[in-house]
Design a protein with these regions (language model features):
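Bacterial N-terminal signal peptides
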Residues: 7-17
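Catalytic grooves of carbohydrate-active enzymes
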Residues: 222, 226-241, 306-332, 342, ...
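Bacterial N-terminal signal peptides that target proteins for export
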Residues: 1-7
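Substrate-binding cleft of extracellular glycoside hydrolase catalytic domains
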Residues: 340-405
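Preference for solvent-exposed, low-hydrophobicity sequence contexts
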Residues: 21-276
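Short, aromatic/basic amphipathic alpha-helical patches
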Residues: 128-150, 247-261, 351-355, 422-427, ...
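Short loop/turn segments at strand-loop or loop-helix junctions that form parts
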Residues: 122, 298-308, 339-340, 366-374, ...
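Active-site beta->alpha N-cap acidic-glycine motif
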Residues: 269-354
Length: 574
């Protein structure tokens, strides 16, 4: 009985603590600098890139501590990041950033007493690609990164030690023989419990934010990663990426009540976050029901691009790639985009605002999960799953109202499970103004267009609609999945069948397009490569006159109107 009362009390106290939401979706705060130092990473060795990341991280930490007023932008060749830098400098009111190379920067920060010494590590040279599961991985760069944040030391690989010693810096820690498990045991009480970084020891990206925010690092799945995810405060962003089965490591993150940010190739997060706090996120425009001709009883279809919960992609090339949102099509085909509006609006506001300014009225934006997570597994390892689901949904509501997001989408392990339905009911109840929700099955993506209905706070039914078809290369076992031309034929077939058999209603359905699938060798189009937006465009061009391609928001309104034929428009918007 005492245990039960104690559990109830803990849940009550957590509920009170969660109620004061700060609008950051778990992301830490990075204070703003007065000056920016730009350091180019071209032609640097891997060891120098790691060194540079640590210098940037120490500056971010010092600014947070109020002992310094300068931060570092690591310059590299990327159009989108160049635009983010320009916007960030404007937001921070910095007109003339300073330029230094990595060794000038080290000397400068040493003189400013930002660097107290160095942490020694050994580079991982295990055979295999980045973010692969490899034999004999050396984890000392990850251990060193943890100590760099705690001891204010730079990351120094063995090959650079003599050069660093010559500067007069002392060795603060030799991380070469300490395991990640021992590091966690020694350091966890000093670390930030509101996030963690999953990162390949080979990779330098994101070590700046890990050092600035004093985060724990891990890599691979298993008991140790589970230990860290349990330790991290629920409802936190887990940075980076991992190796092995995507469903396995994202599932682990989800079951402990967190979300995967898919941010492993992000750059300069400390500076971008600091600048974003001085920007106002723009609301996006979506069609309202009174802008839609509901008397038109044609067959309607929507195409949706997947993987928008991938932060590193949306920040890195999404807006400028002609294959995706940077397409130059003058007569843009209606296509809707899964995206991470909540995370972008907090972390990279300039990226989000660019998207809003570029958005066409015939498209929709779908918040994809509030981060990569599986609603049916969310917080299953915690004793208060329902409470955490509710608080997560309330966060979504706060951001959805601010950004005018109308559609919540997500991937589930089992779309129609009791646990999934519980999540949908909480989402519908807590997120105001939803037009509807779209659900993807992890495998297969499409579930034949089946749907279910859940009620919002006003007792209005909200649909959760699965994709009828998927455009995904190489999945030959799925009869409702194929290339753009094959799926267009299926859509046309359904519309023709409805007329031929005098069905009561014409089809209202949608297709999920796998963002990375390339159909250049199998589909017919002169506009290459056929992937992303161009896959949608190819399929749209092949639709019969019986089918009208519309945004997902319009499709959801039509589904709701058909489901509630006895009600007028005021019923849906009350």
């Amino acid at each position: 009985m005492k245990i039960k009362l104690l559990s109830t009390l803990i849940c009550l106290l957590l509920s009170i603590s969660l109620s004061a939401y700060d609008g950051r979706h778990g992301w830490p705060t990075q204070k703003a600098p007065q000056k920016i130092i730009i350091c180019n990473n071209q032609n640097l060795s891997h060891a120098e890139s790691m060194l540079l990341e640590s210098l940037s991280g120490l500056c971010g930490q010092a600014v947070n501590d109020g002992t310094f007023d300068e931060m570092v932008w690591i310059e590299f060749t990327n159009t989108s990041y160049h635009k983010i830098l320009k916007s960030s400098l404007k937001s921070l009111n910095i007109s003339k950033p300073t330029r230094m190379n990595v060794w000038e920067l080290l000397d400068y920060l040493k003189r400013k007493k930002i660097v107290k010494g160095y942490i020694l590590y050994k580079a991982d040279v295990s055979k295999g690609e980045n973010y692969s599961r490899r034999q004999g991985i050396n984890y000392s760069s990850n251990v060193a990164t943890v100590y760099a944040g705690l001891l204010q030391g730079i990351l120094v690989e063995e090959s650079l030690e003599n050069r660093i010693k010559a500067t007069g810096l002392r060795k603060l820690k030799d991380a070469r023989n300490e395991s990640p498990e021992d590091c966690f045991t020694h350091c966890k009480d000093q670390l930030n419990r509101h996030s963690a970084l999953s990162i390949d020891p080979k990779v330098s990206n994101c070590r700046d934010i890990a050092i600035a925010q004093k985060l724990m690092l891990y890599y691979d799945t298993g008991r140790f990663s589970e230990q860290i995810l349990e330790w991290v405060t629920p409802l936190s962003p887990i940075l980076g990426w991992n190796c092995g089965n995507e469903a396995e490591y994202t599932g682990a993150i989800t079951r402990w009540g967190h979300y995967n940010t898919a941010s492993n190739w992000c750059q300069n997060l400390p500076v971008i976050m600091a600048a974003s706090d001085k920007m106002i996120p723009l609301p996006v425009h979506e069609k309202s029901i009174d802008e839609i001709n509901l008397k038109d009883s044609s067959a309607f279809h929507s195409f949706v691009i997947s993987d928008g919960d991938n932060m590193q992609w949306t920040m890195g090339e999404f807006l400028d790639s002609p294959v995706y949102y940077g397409n130059k099509d003058k007569n843009q085909s209606p296509v809707s985009w899964t995206l991470c509006p909540v995370n972008l609006s907090v972390v990279s506001t300039s990226t989000w605002n660019r998207f809003v300014s570029m958005k066409k009225d015939n498209s929709s934006v779908i918040e994809y999960g509030g981060g990569y997570q599986y609603p049916d597994e969310f917080a299953k390892n915690r004793p208060n799953r329902e409470e955490l689901l509710t608080e997560f949904a309330r966060r979504m509501n706060w951001h959805f109202k601010k950004l005018n997001i109308k559609i919540f989408g997500f991937i589930c392990k089992d779309v129609f499970s009791e646990e999934a339905r519980q999540a949908y009911e909480i989402y519908a109840r807590e997120i105001e103004g939803l037009t509807g929700m779209i659900a993807i099955q992890y495998n297969p993506y499409n579930m034949g267009g089946d749907m279910l209905w859940v009620k919002n706070k006003k007792n209005v039914e909200i649909p959760v609609v699965t994709a009828k078809f998927s455009i995904w290369s190489g999945l030959f076992h799925n009869p409702l999945c194929g290339g753009p031309d094959y799926v267009a034929a299926l859509i046309n077939r359904d519309a023709a069948k409805a007329i031929k058999e005098k069905e009561k209603y014409n089809p209202l359905s949608w297709t999920i397009i796998h963002a990375w699938s390339d159909f250049s060798k199998t589909a017919t189009s002169i506009d290459q490569p056929i992937k992303g937006y161009k896959a949608s465009k190819t399929s749209d061009d092949l639709l019969s006159p019986l089918v009208k391609n519309v945004s997902m928001n319009e499709l959801l309104w039509r589904i709701r109107a058909r489901h509630n034929t006895k009600h007028n428009v005021s019923y849906f918007v009350k």
